[in-house]
């Protein structure tokens, strides 16, 4: 709890609450709340691709062929006005054996600086973000029986992510579930 709290209170890394800044931060690997990400400098200096989620070799709309489509229970973990939902999910036409318009995970669209023509779905891995420190602090406080402190950290995170979020007090199992979700 103390280590996470020191990072949160240090002020160097702040939660991003602006939807456009959040989406651009994931696309361009410029998310200001990132404590550490693996650096890549161009098309010849790449890590893993995340094409599993979208996979579109032509770059044309309507030709997505994902290997993974999130189920409703995953999508339901996010409020529709949550800036994470807006940045990480998109309704797309797909051309797998199932044809239609589905909500896909687009969290790793590919940083334009890391490809030359059609996206390669490579983004710099964001290994640690301050948002995770809020969840670590909430979980640590909950494990110590400090539900009010845990609720504060969880609510601080949700206020930054979900416009019009109303703070609430969590306790017991409801607190644990809220942190994990």
Roles of regions detected by a PLM:
Residues 1-65, 76-181:
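Acidic/polar-rich alpha-helix caps and helix-coil junctions
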Residues 70-71:
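Residue-level signal for threonine
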């Amino acid at each position: 709890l103390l280590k996470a709290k020191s990072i949160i209170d240090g002020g160097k890394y702040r939660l991003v609450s602006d939807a456009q800044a959040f989406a651009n931060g994931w696309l361009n690997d410029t998310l200001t709340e990132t404590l550490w990400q693996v650096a890549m400098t161009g098309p010849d200096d790449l890590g893993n691709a995340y094409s599993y989620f979208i996979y579109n070799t032509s770059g044309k709309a309507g030709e997505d062929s994902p290997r993974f489509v999130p189920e409703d229970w995953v999508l339901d973990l996010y409020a529709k006005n949550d800036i994470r939902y807006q940045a990480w999910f998109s309704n797309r036409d797909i051309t797998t054996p199932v044809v239609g318009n589905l909500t896909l995970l687009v969290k790793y669209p590919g940083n334009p600086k890391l490809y030359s023509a059609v996206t390669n779905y490579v983004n710099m891995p964001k290994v640690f973000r301050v948002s995770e420190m809020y969840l670590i602090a909430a979980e640590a406080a909950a494990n110590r029986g400090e539900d009010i402190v845990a609720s504060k950290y969880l609510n601080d995170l949700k206020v930054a992510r979900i416009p019009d979020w109303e703070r609430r007090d969590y306790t017991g199992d409801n607190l644990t579930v809220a942190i994990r979700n």
